[in-house]
Amino acid sequence: MNNNDIEYNAPSEIKYIDVVNTYDLEEEASKVVPHGGFNYIAGASGDEWTKRANDRAWKHKLLYPRLAQDVEAPDTSTEILGHKIKAPFIMAPIAAHGLAHTTKEAGTARAVSEFGTIMSISAYSGATFEEISEGLNGGPRWFQIYMAKDDQQNRDILDEAKSDGATAIILTADSTVSGNRDRDVKNKFVYPFGMPIVQRYLRGTAEGMSLNNIYGASKQKISPRDIEEIAGHSGLPVFVKGIQHPEDADMAIKRGASGIWVSNHGARQLYEAPGSFDTLPAIAERVNKRVPIVFDSGVRRGEHVAKALASGADVVALGRPVLFGLALGGWQGAYSVLDYFQKDLTRVMQLTGSQNVEDLKGLDLFDNPYGYEY
């Protein structure tokens, strides 16, 4: 999409979809989402090596089948920060759901609420707090902040999020500038609609702006003090998102973080960074259960959820697959994806002898000496 486009025609159909696997959803979504919007959602930095590394990293550790473990009807439910959720996954904060469907974040929110897990609301949402809240219908929500340069604007946004019902804040700290996203550059991509939550600090509403313009209006000089100030002002638990190094996890906890979010931003930021799953074990070891860990980047199967939990995560966050489901069927399509993950995880739990989520966290993994080519 470019500035000459008059109208962005996102899909609008609402229907449940059949999900065989989430990889196929990407190709299906490419047929219904406008070219620029699809490539914004699906794309990553550079030639997308790190996106491929996110997928290949799962092959570095394998699951042992376990026999005669006295397991039947595994229980996928768990709890994080006092929220009981149906399965150990939540919705990741993603900008601009309206690229995938006309219902925007409100559609995703309804799917998340109907399923029974937590919605992470992005500051770069194309919908208002009120619209998203209507979709959630009382369901739990966390709020992800991209910081403004003006601290008072940050405080105002945090106050609004808290008034809206947010029970935790996610500080995305890995995006002080945009990654070099080749697809968006080639497409001359600009956002076709506004970002009402952060338009107060943009030079405009975000409509017609590029990602570089938007990141340029946000705070680049994020410091440990910002973690302290967000926690102190909001009075809410703060997750620091974008952690890929154990020392950063340790710093965040010491400066007041109540949770660590292991993520490489879906491979959309630093090019030639490690596959996100490869970084998780060392971070979990350093965290040593002091605070909960959320993991994202590359989760596509029930096996991936199981491996992440066995490697130290408490829950995982789902991103692109849910948006592809939204594109293909609105809230019902997004719900179908969440339902697929639960059913796939239940199957994995049965085959690994895991009656509940705590059993998953205790699984031993096989270190694959052959790597991806095994």
Curated annotation (Swiss-Prot):
Impact after mutating residue 95 to G: The mutant is three-fold more reactive towards DCIP than O2 as the electron acceptor, whereas wild-type under the same conditions is 14-fold more reactive towards O2 than DCIP
InterPro entries hit by this protein: Aldolase_TIM, Alpha-hydoxy_acid_DH_FMN, FMN-dep_DH, FMN_HAD, FMN_hydac_DH_AS, L_lactate_ox
Annotated binding of FMN, by residue: 93-95, 122, 144, 172, 241, 263, 296-300, 320
Annotated site (Is suggested to participate in control of opening/closing motions of the active-site lid in A.viridans LOX): 215
Thermal activity characteristics from the UniProt entry: Optimum temperature is 35 degrees Celsius.
Enzyme Commission code(s) on record: 1.1.3.-
Enzyme class: oxidoreductase
Mutagenesis or variant effect for residue 191 to F: 4-fold decrease in activity and 6-fold increase in affinity for (L)-lactate
Superkingdom of the source species: Bacteria
Active site: 265 (proton acceptor)
Names of required cofactors: FMN
Biotechnology note: Is widely used in biosensors to measure the lactate concentration in blood and other tissues.
Domain FMN hydroxy acid dehydrogenase: 14-370
Catalyzed reactions: (S)-lactate + O2 = pyruvate + H2O2
SUPFAM superfamilies: FMN-linked oxidoreductases (SSF51395)
Annotated positions binding pyruvate: 40, 146, 181, 215, 265, 268
Keywords associated with the record: Flavoprotein, FMN, Metal-binding, Nucleotide-binding, Oxidoreductase, Pyruvate
Assembly behavior: Homotetramer.
Note: The proposed reaction pathway consists of two half-reactions, in which FMN is first reduced by L-lactate to become subsequently reoxidized by O2.
Similarity comment text for this entry: Belongs to the FMN-dependent alpha-hydroxy acid dehydrogenase family.
Function comment: Catalyzes the oxidation of (S)-lactate (L-lactate) to pyruvate, with a reduction of O2 to H2O2. Cannot oxidize D-lactate, glycolate, and D,L-2-hydroxybutanoate. May be involved in the utilization of L-lactate as an energy source for growth.
Name this polypeptide is given: L-lactate oxidase
Lineage of producing organism: Bacteria, Bacillati, Bacillota, Bacilli, Lactobacillales
